[in-house]
Design a protein with these regions (language model features):
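ABC family nucleotide-binding domain
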Residues: 2-165
Length: 165
């Protein structure tokens, strides 16, 4: 099953065409690496794939649901905001700067979005967060604050936070 399809994606900033007719698909269980020199469009492609940046033209499909497509003039048109919010539940991001909230424990960092954004049950979210911490191996650090963690532990906490969504 294809989780993500990007077809004929184009993106320009001023006179600089950053993405030039890029197409790719990612199937369930597949691992994909995007490699290139600085300024080659890697981050822009990921930002377009995750709806943080709009494409000039192209098609974006998650699990068969179209998030964006071209109109008759060849410009990208996006689905309604309510549909995009549903689609955004399919993915989470971990940035180079992990941005864990410094005044929250690791556990609270993981639980915050599922509780506030998804309005999920606190006991259910707590159980899931602890399971994620166990898998990510900083389970003994659930009460620690980001400044008390190594960079690797911060990264794993951030990955657990993304997976919790």
């Amino acid at each position: 099953m294809k989780l993500l399809e990007m077809n004929h994606v184009k993106k320009t900033f001023a006179d600089n065409q950053v993405l030039k007719d890029i197409s790719l698909s990612v199937s369930e269980g597949e691992v994909v690496s995007i490699i290139g020199p600085s300024g080659s469009g890697k981050s822009t492609l990921l930002r377009c794939a995750t709806l943080l940046e709009t494409m000039d033209s192209g098609e974006l499909i998650y699990l068969g649901e179209k998030a964006a497509w071209n109109d008759a003039g060849g410009r990208a048109v996006y689905a309604k905001n309510s549909e995009l919010k549903t689609i955004q539940r399919y993915f989470g991001l971990v940035f180079q700067n992990f941005n864990l909230f410094p005044h929250y424990s690791v556990l609270r960092n993981i639980m915050d979005a599922p509780l506030c954004v998804q309005k999920r049950n606190k006991d259910e979210v707590l159980k899931e967060a602890r399971e994620l911490l166990k898998k990510m191996r900083p389970s003994d650090k659930e009460d620690a604050y980001p400044c008390q963690l190594s960079r690797g532990q911060q990264q794993r906490g951030s990955i657990a936070r993304a997976l919790a969504m």
